[in-house]
Amino acid sequence: MSNTILQKARDYEEEHSAAISAAERPAYHLTPYVGWMNDPNGFSFYHGKYHLFYQYNPYATQWGPMHWGHAVSTDLLHWEYLPCAIAPDSTSDNGPGCFSGSATEMDDGRQLLMYTSVVSEKQPNGEMRDIQTQSVAVGDGLDYEKPACNPVLTQKDLPEGYSKFDFRDPKIWREADGTYSAVTVALTEDGSGAAVLFQSKDGFDWHFVTVLARNNNVYGKMWECPDFFPLDGKHVLMVGPMEMRPSGEFHNGHNVIAFVGSYDEKTHTFTREQVQLVDGGIDFYATQTTQAPDGRRLMTAWLQTWSDTEDKPQGCKWFGQTICPRELHLKDGRIVQTPVRELDAAHGKRTLHENVTVQNETVLAGIGGRIADLTVTVAAGEYRSFTVKLAADAAYHTRLTYDPYTSLLTLDRSCAGSRADIVHTRSCKVRSQNGALKLRILLDKNSVEVFVNDGEQTMTAWIYTPQSADGITFAADGQATITVEQFELNL
């Protein structure tokens, strides 16, 4: 099969991308070149730029045959679109398409993409089923070729009893000695997921190493979108569990969870020591990390979940976006997240209100807008609740409410203009500090990202509220003393 399918996608991009103006996109969150985006893929630093690929249907604002969209950036805020990287145009991926994967640099300077290749195959009972294998493509950062050795991993490379129908999402990296490693997820004989490690000397000939972790039906069923990386002296395994019932902090339906533990590189043994929810908001899935040239561990994710993909503004020309990339660290054995420091370099006009006492709904001069970096610090006190309204006018708002007695922070977009039959609220329990609370809030037209107490928790959601609703207000039940700092963003 020739690459005419890829060229068709590239021609479509060139013809239709001009119909989407910069004003119709977020200011610093990546959206698809055209059409639909879901999982971010191939997040990497290659030849002086950050590369971010993504699951992509260029032809419609809904899921369809999966291609890989492609964009590059030098600062993680401004993204340049490149032509579609790969398309379902080979015998190993000519079914639903080229599913999620990752990227790394090869010894010869080429970039290696590793992805889940899917074909539809007739089963003995006559049923058509999608078979998932892993394939590679090699290129120069713009154009990629699929070698004849594809697929490079199939069911025969898995432990006995693992499913060929659920075997996907390879995350690839290079070891210190140059070895290629990749973690995938697969469905085990007990009907739940496992993280499986493979290795290769050249990136093409792969072999099974070990099962890093099994779910054993504890955290949902099948796992998706694995990542495995060192962080501040520990190792982290991130996965997206499917069909996970609410339990404790794991309550947002499409969780991303992180196991923090110790990894023995000689025996390839990962010992889990604790587990946590990665984001407690409404719209956050399919994480992927990379290491920056300066050593920082950076994370991106899909700012969406599968349960509300039909809720989009009428006439929208694109669908799906990624989060503002985040820096990851460990604090007391748990992951903390902060916006990438590149965002600080975009800070423009600063507005500061210190030690303001609020009770009834309060508007502060110079505080507002839909593109902003806002920090709200609430002093310890005896107030009963505190609320920030974002993207607000007489008809719309998204609300953050903190109850110091239960230590619950609630994100509520029920008045944001979304449909009535999707999830509107999520709550997370934050560290109790006698009412003291710090919220850093990133606004970007269609989204809100909240970093609680310097990133100990985060909450993320899209908000398809009319852009004219740009007010920000503060209120308390009782009296709360707050300091508010807002930076406009020069983007």
Which residues are covered by each model-predicted region?
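Beta-rich accessory regions
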Residues: 10-15, 260-491
